[in-house]
Amino acid sequence: MIRRLAAALAALAILWAAPAAASCSAANTYNFSFSNQAAASLNYANTYTYAATTSGGATQNFTTSFATNGLSSTNVGGTNVPAITTTLTTSTGGKTLMIGGTFSGRTTSISGTTRVIATTFTFGVKIRDLAITIHDIDFTSNQYRDWVMVTGSDGTNTYTPTMVTPFGTNNTTGGTAGNSALTLGPTGSPYNLTNQQAVGTDASDTGSNFGDISISFAQPVTSVTIRYGNYPLLNGEKTTGQQAYGISAIAFCPMPAIAMTKSSAPAATTGTGRFDAPGSDEIYTITVTNNGGSPVDASTIVLTDTLPSQASFFNGAFSPATTPFLLNAGSSGVTLAAANASYSNNGTTYTYTPSAGYDPNVKAVKFSPQGTMAANSSFTIQYRAQIK
């Protein structure tokens, strides 16, 4: 009897057990700068949409929204905030998104909602390698002590960023370095800060980098929130005044976009074997494509494929390879050695050692390609089986 064995789709698992580590190329990185935007007076009640672009012209929209509580004034230095303005600039003189005002009193909890300004950037889809630069986190006695807290979210989990000043301090060890106008958490008295927070401890004039923080996330996120307040009164302080900080630049990478197909074809091109007759061989081809502009982290792709019940796996050299499978890596950068394949005789555990030649006891195969799969690339894996 002549019969066709359908190519059942293989199962594909992308393992994200660790934070994303394979950065995308500069050409695939999305960049946005408020310095390139027209000066504008904004409103805390509104949501604004901006477009980040790659050097190749691809665009990715994101939104900026605000939640405020306890502001008695939204004027800082003669500028109504929020605003895209040169009132508060970067060290190179560029415009920033200036956020602030005057609170009715000091902030008691930066993670709460009282006397806090929360600025949220929402990207709509998961992105990776997000980096944001903020400016002018500082302190003036009896007026303000800037207090910020930064968190990221993927919609389910909350993440802590890496926070670094130009002077070497970070939120792993915390503390203050010379010239820096701020202290990063984690710290204890007198500033009780977590590693998501920073406070101003000295003056930083607009246009300097003394109050700068570079913020980045290892984990993929869909949104980031920067919370801003005025740290509780210390050292005899009695009053509260106007304050502001700036946001200048945002950069991020797209996620990988993995797709997979499986096909089958007779190994023979002539004779009865080309009709998938019993005793003839079938070649199965699994194609994996990364259509995204970001690479797939090394050794995180796992493919499992169940053989049809009428097929016997061929455990012999698949020419020109010396293994029972053939990898065509293309430009993907992945490799696949004999040790990266395993076999199952029950479809559940992959500890079975196949017999030489055609082995009907092989019920499923597992392939674990090694290396980082490049952006915008594909590879194929082929193996063969005999029709019973």
Regions found by a protein language model. Give the residues of each.
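Short, flexible beta-strand-to-coil junctions
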Residues: T102-S104, H135-S141, G229-P232
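Exported/extracytosolic protein signature
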Residues: M255-K388
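N-terminal targeting leaders for non-cytosolic proteins
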Residues: S23-G112, T151, G155-T194
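Low-complexity, serine/threonine/proline/glycine-rich extracellular segments that form mucin-like
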Residues: S111, V116-I117, F121-D154, Y159-M163, ...
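Extracellular beta-rich ligand/substrate-recognition surface
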Residues: M98-R115, V199-S208, T372-M373
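Extracellular beta-strand-rich recognition modules
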Residues: L130-I134, S223-G229, F379-I381
